[in-house]
Amino acid sequence: MGRIAKYYREYGIRIVKGFMQYVWDDKGQRYIDCNTNHGVVFLGHANPKIVEAVKKQVEEIWAVPLNFATPARERFIEEFSKLLPPKFGVVFLQNTGTEAVEVAIKIAKKVTRKPTIVAFTNSFHGRTMGSLSITWNEKYKKAFEPLYPHVRFGKFNVPHEVDKLIGEDTCCVVVEPIQGEGGVNPATPEFLKALREEAQRKGALLIFDEVQTGFGRTGAVWAFQKYGVEPDIFTAGKPVAGGLPIGLAVAREDFGDVFEPGEHGSTFAGNAVVMAAAAAASRLLREEDVPGRAERIGAELAKALGDTGSRLAVRVKGMGLMLGLELRVKADQFIQPLLERGVMALTAGVNTLRFLPPYMISKEDVEVVHAAVTEVLKKAEQQ
């Protein structure tokens, strides 16, 4: 019998069911899901509105190539467009966040005809070869070098160095408004504004990677809206199809015809079932004011995480329901103890516990998370 290759740490838990902000293991233990598959299930496990849309679609048709129109795709773009600022008129459909980053880079290369990509310390953009090339951490890259050579890394959140960083050879600048994997590090408004101005001056495109930050999690539909800085292209993914695989590059209207037939493609992009889920998710986001809910309950969670009373805790970082608790010690030692107390979390960087719960997490859930985090930190202090 074959087996699934192992390249993830295993926690010895078999998850069998999920509903909204909770999951259950095969022993009946319930967990508050603040992991959500790295942010994918922001709209909740088995959300009834998304389940209904998927059930309806699977009885009609599943996979149709992009050469043909489908009602599912048309419904998606109609709903998704309501979430976009006016400048963004073109959506490039993909299957994952890393693919979305790849196509954004391809657009920039085709438009500018320049070689160099600018990225930043502690960045994470994916694990395919292009997005891996602009990811900072060597542990992800070392085994696969040489990667794309024309990458220049600058210091994140250092606006006064931007003019030297972005050159006449720069095709694009790729940045996360809040670094996720790198430590839940929000960009400063001054930094993003400096990138916007210098990219414009040098004829480079500004790309915001919103795969983790986007679709309501930070308290706005798109994190860049909180900064008042618009990119030329932004990527999205994770929660956009309610838990099904999707990636998007969203671009200015004038980039809509940048590729000739054959210059880009994707077998599964625009899958009808995924499109049905994404249309339902987009409608739900708007009708239930998901960003507003994320802002309000996120403030409650941030306050709770900042009130552990532990000397191991440094500060709470992030926005909305994308939060990190920075510690004075390595964070990965707390994942298993939190699981034992019914809380699923994840790490970001070396010393940050990351919390990415669904938007419907309740005040009672926040209290449980607070109690669990407080307990594991206090216990660690005593050892």
Swiss-Prot record:
It is found in: Cytoplasm. SUPFAM superfamilies: PLP-dependent transferases. It holds the Pfam family Aminotran_3. It is an enzyme of class 2 (transferase). Keywords: Amino-acid biosynthesis, Aminotransferase, Arginine biosynthesis, Cytoplasm, Lysine biosynthesis, Pyridoxal phosphate, Transferase. GO terms for cellular component: cytoplasm. Its EC number is 2.6.1.118, 2.6.1.124. Its main location: cytoplasm. It catalyses: [amino-group carrier protein]-C-terminal-gamma-(L-lysyl)-L-glutamate + 2-oxoglutarate = [amino-group carrier protein]-C-terminal-N-(1-carboxy-5-oxopentan-1-yl)-L-glutamine + L-glutamate; [amino-group carrier protein]-C-terminal-gamma-(L-ornithyl)-L-glutamate + 2-oxoglutarate = [amino-group carrier protein]-C-terminal-gamma-(L-glutamyl-5-semialdehyde)-L-glutamate + L-glutamate. GO terms for molecular function: identical protein binding; pyridoxal phosphate binding; transaminase activity. Involved in both the arginine and lysine biosynthetic pathways. Homodimer. Belongs to the class-III pyridoxal-phosphate-dependent aminotransferase family. LysJ subfamily. This is Putative [LysW]-aminoadipate semialdehyde/glutamate semialdehyde transaminase. It comes from Pyrobaculum aerophilum (strain ATCC 51768 / DSM 7523 / JCM 9630 / CIP 104966 / NBRC 100827 / IM2). The gene is lysJ.
